[in-house]
Amino acid sequence: MIAAQRVQAPSCENKIRDAKATKRKLVEAALAAFSTRGYEASSTRSIEAAAGVKRGLIAYHFGSKAQLWTAAADYLMSTTEHDLGEALASLNEADEAARLRLFVRAYVAFCARYPELNRLMIQEGMDRDWRLDWLLERSVRPWYGHVCRIFDQAAELGVAPNFEAHHFYYIVTGAAT
């Protein structure tokens, strides 16, 4: 006689952990796809394949490709706000003359760690639509304000070149990508 084996159902905690891991894989795969190929050229099928998950899980976890894009961009912006927020906070401890130099180093290091940020901006900048507006409101405008403020303070001290802050913003962003 063959003994019956008991199969234990996965615990609720395991299901939640698995769902979070799946969502994280999808967000990371989507970010890679959207930042390199763009929104229109990235199919949900290819994103699910890159994430190594079953077909249909984008619809299950996010509802739509647009909501996945928002989740991926939000993840990237949250990372940006956290990492660059820490860098900005540390600038307050630096003397006035060192702030600009430390800022540039922190921003270039961040862009090296997360090249998807500027890649996504380039991809979305090709089409004027809701995604570009979302990025501008959520990331570019607030960050631009910080950059201009730091540059203007350095210019007042004579430790920054004599040109407009917006030129500096584009020079640093271009150099960092």
Predicted regions and their residues:
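Conserved hydrophobic residue
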Residues: Y39-E40, R131, A160
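N-terminal intrinsically disordered/low-complexity leader segments
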Residues: M1-A21, A32, L88
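Generic hydrophobic, amphipathic alpha-helix propensity
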Residues: T22-L31, I47, L68, A72-L76, ...
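Helix-turn-helix
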Residues: K25, A33-Q67, A71
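Hydrophobic alpha-helical connector segments
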Residues: G85-L117, L157, A165-V172
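Amphipathic alpha-helical segments used for helix-helix packing
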Residues: A112-W134
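Amphipathic alpha-helical packing segments from all-alpha helical-bundle domains
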Residues: S78-G85, A98, W130-E156, H167
